Regions:
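Nucleotide-activated donor-binding/catalytic signature segment of Leloir-type glycosyltransferases, i.e.
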Residues: 111, 115-120, 297-326
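Conserved catalytic-core segment of nucleotide-activated headgroup transferases in glycan assembly
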Residues: 78-93, 235-313
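Conserved sugar-transfer catalytic core signal across GT-A, GT-B, and GT-C glycosyltransferases
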Residues: 154, 263, 331, 354-355, ...
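Active-site and donor-binding regions of nucleotide-sugar-utilizing enzymes
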Residues: 8-11, 17, 31-227, 232, ...
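Structural alpha-helical scaffold elements that stabilize or flank donor/cofactor-binding regions
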Residues: 135-137, 189, 317, 335, ...
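Acidic donor-binding loop of glycosyltransferase active sites
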Residues: 139-143, 319-351
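C-terminal alpha-helical cap of glycosyltransferases
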Residues: 425-440
Length: 440
């Protein structure tokens, strides 16, 4: 049964007027860069018509049957979290089906293998009023759930139709500053939400200061930090691939996870230095954006490293390499289990940091640079408990890695302490899914 239409509050209408006034010129200004990224990443033709709110007759027929929840994500990180939430929603409400929408081709590539009877993967529509209305007409969701980012027109269109809408955000210092700067716009949009799932108790005051009503805030814990078993079969497969390259099981492995420009060169140079003391050391680099693989190979060329790309790795054997470049998506979590020490990307040459909890949940010690703003709460607790290592620069990175590679007991202690702190978020996935699914 379709809910009755609802009028938007005047403040929300004013905010949307401003948004739609500036959206076209901003979109056109950003379009060349967006198209360039799409071309580099590939896969942009996949269901491109859905970005304009157009669906095939077969897709519309499928959405016309069953009870659909629209789960809205952006790229790889958000999509992995969305898949986790989707599975929990399905467990809580097995009669529901999920339409998982993504923006990037890499996010689509991660989500698509999970599509099935109850999960349909689609592309996010452009956030223009007529396009999102067309998309809602096709998908016919009973509820809209946003993961880490809100499409204002999509949210408004859902609320006009009387649909509940909930939000699982990430409140980094950068995003908080942006929300505060444009509070005149963001606060009325936030007030359209039926519920917001906050990761930490201290986040509630921050969200209230940004305009979210206290009654709509729920503290659920961080679902990203809630342990999910890695795929043991995939890890075994990856171990066999390393063995086929001549890498013995007891060889120390340094893994750089979700690295950003500049960090690959630092890791490679560090690796060459450490090899003098640890001759069996092997390096794995997983760039955050796999389309940078060719640029990384070019940058590392002067170092004369023997590099093999994951996309070209068949298990048939080749000359013993120095470095494995993970230029595939959706595999990193299962590679972490093979590492001896993990460096967290986007923390040395960029700001914000990438998710440090996945390697910790795999039982691996983590090292990161000075910039972990997006994960400030948990990394601060780790550092206070001597459960992780933070370095200031490349020189200190070399020193700390040398210490850890030489000290198995220290590595085990770090991993155990960090995992114990992360375990405090056990159950966060269920609490988050319940909030996002049932709040009205």
């Amino acid at each position: 049964m379709t809910p009755p239409p609802s009028a938007l509050p005047p403040a929300a209408r004013r905010a949307l007027f401003i948004y739609n006034l500036f959206f076209p010129p901003v979109f056109l200004a950003l379009l060349p860069g967006f198209l360039l990224r799409m071309l580099r990443r590939g896969g942009y033709r996949e269901k491109f018509r859905q970005r304009l709110g157009r669906y095939t007759a077969a897709e519309c027929a499928r959405f016309a049957q069953g009870e659909w929840i629209w789960l809205h994500s952006i790229s790889v990180g958000e999509t992995l979290l969305a898949l986790k939430i989707a599975c929990e929603i399905r467990r809580l409400a097995p009669e529901k089906s999920i339409a998982l929408s993504v923006t990037t081709s890499t996010g689509f590539a991660v989500a698509q293998p999970h599509a099935g009877d109850w999960l349909e993967v689609i592309c996010n529509p452009l956030d223009a009023p007529w396009i999102v209305h067309r998309a809602l007409d096709a998908v016919r969701p009973q509820r809209l759930i946003f993961i880490e980012a809100i499409w204002p027109n999509l949210l408004a269109a859902a609320k006009r139709r009387g649909l509940p809408a909930t939000f699982l955000p990430r409140l980094s210092p950068r995003s908080e500053a942006r929300f505060r700067r444009f509070r005149f716009f963001t606060a009325p949009i936030f007030r359209l939400l039926d519920a917001l799932a906050a990761a930490e108790p201290e986040d509630t005051a921050r969200w209230q200061s940004l305009g979210v009503e206290p009654a709509r805030l729920r503290v659920t814990g961080n679902a990203k930090f809630d342990a999910t078993a890695s795929d043991g079969a995939r890890t075994a497969e990856f171990r066999a691939l390393l063995q086929s390259l001549g890498i013995p099981d007891d060889a120390p492995v340094l893994l750089g996870g979700s690295t950003f420009p500049g960090e690959e060169c630092i890791l490679a140079e560090t690796f060459l230095t450490l090899r003098g003391k640890f001759p069996a050391l092997f390096l794995i680099i997983a760039p955050r954006h796999v389309e940078r693989a060719a640029a990384i190979l070019s940058e590392l060329s002067p170092l004369n490293l023997r590099i093999v790309r994951r996309s070209e790795l068949t298990g048939s054997g080749s000359q013993l390499p120095d470095l494995l470049l993970l230029d595939t998506t959706g595999e990193l979590r299962d590679w972490y289990a093979l590492a001896t020490v993990v460096f967290i990307g986007k923390s040395l040459t960029a700001t914000g940091g990438q998710n440090p909890v996945e390697p910790v949940l795999a039982g691996r010690p983590v090292v990161f640079g000075p910039h972990m703003e997006n994960f400030a709460a948990i990394t601060a607790r780790w550092l206070a408990a001597d459960a992780a290592v933070q370095v200031r620069d490349a020189a200190e990175l070399r020193t700390q890695l040398a210490t850890l590679l030489a000290d198995p007991a220290r590595r085990a202690t770090l991993a155990q302490r960090a995992r114990a702190i992360a375990a405090e978020h056990t159950g966060a996935t269920t609490r988050t899914a319940e909030t996002l699914l049932f709040s009205r």
